């Protein structure tokens, strides 16, 4: 099977990850390829669903959401809901930025953002634990984020 992305596509994606607003002329210069090629490749990557959307990376500290926490959840199979249904309910909670169904000792992993640890606690205690199907939880507050990609 042929590789889906060639070297040029990968370099183009890396540049767009750094700055999705970079114009075609600048990308052409950085990558050493014609502007028409850059335009065509971006169009193809969009059409093939490799690029889903162009987005931003907010500064969460400036948005008063400087505390990141990860929450592990044990699914309660006696709840009458499927694990996916529980995860979909959790995804609706303000402050929950990611919801993953995972393998292992725990069933669901969340990424939560809030102003401080107290606000994270409110999300977990007042919102998350009220959802039918959420069993035991463990919350880990991040001290420092070393790497985070969009």
Swiss-Prot record:
**Protein name as annotated:** Uncharacterized HTH-type transcriptional regulator PF0250
Keywords of the record, alphabetical order, are: DNA-binding, Transcription, Transcription regulation
Q: Which residues bind DNA?
A: 24-43
Q: Which GO terms describe its biological process?
A: response to amino acid
Q: Where is the HTH asnC-type domain?
A: 5-66
PROSITE patterns noted in UniProt:
HTH_ASNC_2
* Lineage: superkingdom: Archaea
Cited InterPro entries: ArsR-like_HTH (IPR011991), AsnC-type_HTH_dom (IPR000485), Dimeric_a/b-barrel (IPR011008), Tscrpt_reg_AsnC-like (IPR019888), Tscrpt_reg_AsnC/Lrp_C (IPR019887), WH-like_DNA-bd_sf (IPR036388), WH_DNA-bd_sf (IPR036390)
Signal sequence annotation? none
Coiled coil (residue ranges): none
Instruction: Give this protein's Gene Ontology molecular function annotations.
Output: sequence-specific DNA binding
- Could you give one GO CC term from the UniProt record? cytosol
């Amino acid at each position: 099977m042929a590789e889906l992305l060639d070297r040029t596509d990968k370099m183009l994606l890396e540049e767009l990850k750094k700055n999705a607003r970079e114009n075609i002329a600048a990308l052409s210069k950085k990558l050493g390829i014609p502007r028409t090629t850059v335009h065509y490749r971006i169009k193809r990557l969009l059409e093939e669903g490799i690029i889903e959307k162009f987005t931003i990376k907010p500064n969460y500290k400036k948005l008063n959401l400087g505390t990141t926490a990860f929450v592990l959840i044990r699914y309660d199979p006696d709840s009458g809901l499927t694990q996916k249904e529980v995860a979909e309910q959790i995804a609706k909670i303000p402050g929950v930025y990611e919801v993953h169904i995972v393998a292992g000792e725990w069933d669901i992993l969340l990424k939560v953002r809030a102003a401080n640890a107290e606000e994270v606690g409110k999300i977990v205690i007042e919102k998350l634990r009220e959802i039918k199907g959420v069993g035991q939880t463990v919350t880990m507050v991040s001290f420092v984020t070393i790497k985070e990609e969009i």
